[in-house]
Each structure stands twice: as C-alpha cells, then as structure tokens.
Amino acid sequence: LNMSMLQYFWDIQNQEEHRKLFQGLEIEHSPYMAEQGKYPVIFITLKDIKERNWKDCFTQIKILVKNLYNSFEFVRSSLNPSELRSFDKIWFEEESGDYRNALKMLSFFLKKYYQTKVIILIDEYDTPIVSAYEHGYYEEAISFFRNFYSSALKDNEYLQMGVMTGILRVAKEGIFSGLNN
C-alpha cells in the first residue's frame, strides 16, 4: 500500500487523476505537493518470484521485466535504432536481452522520453533471494540480483530516487556494497 501511494504521488502518468487521491490530506498543503506528478516511476514487485530452481526463477524475472517494459511501450518512439534493439530484446524476452541492467536501461529510456530523472520503486526485493536460499540456488540468484539492483540504484545517473522494501536488512545481505541510503 505504501509503495502504491508513492507511485501515485510521484508518477508523471495520470498525474491529474492521481492528484485527486491527495485532496483533503495534510500533504496537499505541504511544499512536497510541488513534487506530485513530476517523475516517471518504475514500480516492480518481486513478491511472486518463489521458484524451486534458478532456471524457473530467471524465467519469471524475464516475464516480469517484459511486462514492465510493455507498460512503457510508448517510449519506443523516442529511441534510436540501437536503443530500440535493446528495448525489444527485453520486450520480446530474447535470451540475449540484458536483464541484469534492465531497470537501468528502462530508466534511461524514460529519462530520454520525459527529459527528467526517474524514480524506481522495488517491492519485496528479497523474496526471490529467500526462495533461492531455501531451494539451493542462492549463489546464482545473488549474483544476478546484486547486479540487477546495483545497476538500477547505485550506478544510475538517470535515477532521481529509489525505494526498496523487504524483510531482510540490505546491509546484512551484502547485495549493495557502498549503498547505504
């Protein structure tokens, strides 16, 4: 619920419709209201990625990311041929798609389209990691997610802000060396 609220607050898409959700609330009279509807928002939840092996886990990740790209299909019109190929490799779930950097690439595409930095919301970031630990493919999963999250949140010049939720302490997992905000 909190992540949805953040999405509705910041998302540049449907900003006028979303503004109505905050009418009559304290934030409506706050200086923060000037930020409402100002950013493209990438919202991804990993709550349903609970697979028994890495192959199935990665298949579900590809489907999830493809669906995310599908929701931003309109940005394709602003991409050059090389960028379009990168977008389409994910969109069509090709094996050669750069899934480790998919969120960072999507943030680049959105930044290019909207000419403003992007907010990334990741809900239940740790569900696939817990499942991987329980089912014996932790090393493969942690290797993927370390890059997936770091490229999106740590080394991303197109990022305005990122928010993650989960039950594991990020510092304990060692997923983000040097990412402590």
Residue positions per predicted region:
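Phosphate-binding site recognition
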Residues: 1-181
